[in-house]
Amino acid sequence: MTAIPTPYEDLLRTIRDEGAHKDDRTGTGTTSLFGQQIRYNLQEGFPLLTTKKVHFHSVVGELLWFLRGDSNVRWLQDNNIRIWNEWADEDGELGPVYGVQWRSWPTPDGRHIDQISRALEMLKNNPDSRRNIVSAWNVSELENMALPPCHLLFQLYVADGKLSCQLYQRSADMFLGVPFNIASYALLTHMFAQQADLEVGEFIWTGGDCHIYDNHTEQVDEQLSRAARPYPTLELNKAASLFDYTFEDIAVSNYDPHPLIRGKVAV
């Protein structure tokens, strides 16, 4: 039987065993390594972790919310997703966070750039471009964001008819956040590929400060004691456009994870 690749779990173990102890903004404390990378071949399954259950409905909903260009948590709440509640103000606003920058990056002359539409257009018309980058790190608006972007930039790359995506994440909560981010950007890669009539290639995750919070150490030990199971298969109905996907278009089959492991979010 072919061994199941476990690049996330391998990195999690390395950070646990070899990381440096650091203080952090939240006051929780972390064990951390800098400048790490994980690679997944998207042809070999959808990288939704099996060593613990990942709430795929929330992964899908957050990505659809980003693609809407939304900055308010109400749409998420209406779809039973509460992962952004801790950072929202009393009106549900988060400021010009991910979706706003993706879909409506402001220019000095008052225009707005739809980076997602531009990225898809480039895949179709100039797939060999080395400039196909989407950034959420708008320095001029960071102070107005409830939380500066952690996963802040991704680049798209086409070779042999296959689309690969590399994400850079400056701050990586390895236990809670990163499993979610891996699934989200893998899904986005599939969506871009489908809309551009490409196959999927690799998803490459690159992390800056890759950390395990001190209050997640027992959960990490539990997760690393579990044997990985086969990855599920993504079922993706082709929508009329990249912005027309709904929950009903996106599902995973044969997802058989170990049970959920809960952990407290550091705010």
From Swiss-Prot:
GO terms for cellular component: cytosol. InterPro entries: Thymidate_synth/dCMP_Mease (IPR045097), Thymidate_synth/dCMP_Mease_dom (IPR023451), Thymidate_synth/dCMP_Mease_sf (IPR036926), Thymidylate_synthase (IPR000398), Thymidylate_synthase_AS (IPR020940). (6R)-5,10-methylene-5,6,7,8-tetrahydrofolate binds at H55, D173, A266. It catalyses: dUMP + (6R)-5,10-methylene-5,6,7,8-tetrahydrofolate = 7,8-dihydrofolate + dTMP. One of its GO terms (molecular function) is thymidylate synthase activity. DUMP binds at R25, R130, R131, R170, S171, A172, D173, N181, H211, I212, Y213. PROSITE patterns: THYMIDYLATE_SYNTHASE. Pathway: Pyrimidine metabolism; dTTP biosynthesis. It comes from the Bacteria. It is found in: Cytoplasm. The active site is at C150. GO terms for biological process: dTMP biosynthetic process; dTTP biosynthetic process; methylation. Keywords: Cytoplasm, Methyltransferase, Nucleotide biosynthesis, Transferase. The keyword Phosphoprotein does not apply. Homodimer. Catalyzes the reductive methylation of 2'-deoxyuridine-5'-monophosphate (dUMP) to 2'-deoxythymidine-5'-monophosphate (dTMP) while utilizing 5,10-methylenetetrahydrofolate (mTHF) as the methyl donor and reductant in the reaction, yielding dihydrofolate (DHF) as a by-product. This enzymatic reaction provides an intracellular de novo source of dTMP, an essential precursor for DNA biosynthesis. Belongs to the thymidylate synthase family. Bacterial-type ThyA subfamily. NCBIfam families: PRK01827.1-3 (NF002497), PRK01827.1-5 (NF002499), thym_sym (TIGR03284). This is Thymidylate synthase. It comes from Corynebacterium efficiens (strain DSM 44549 / YS-314 / AJ 12310 / JCM 11189 / NBRC 100395). The gene is thyA.
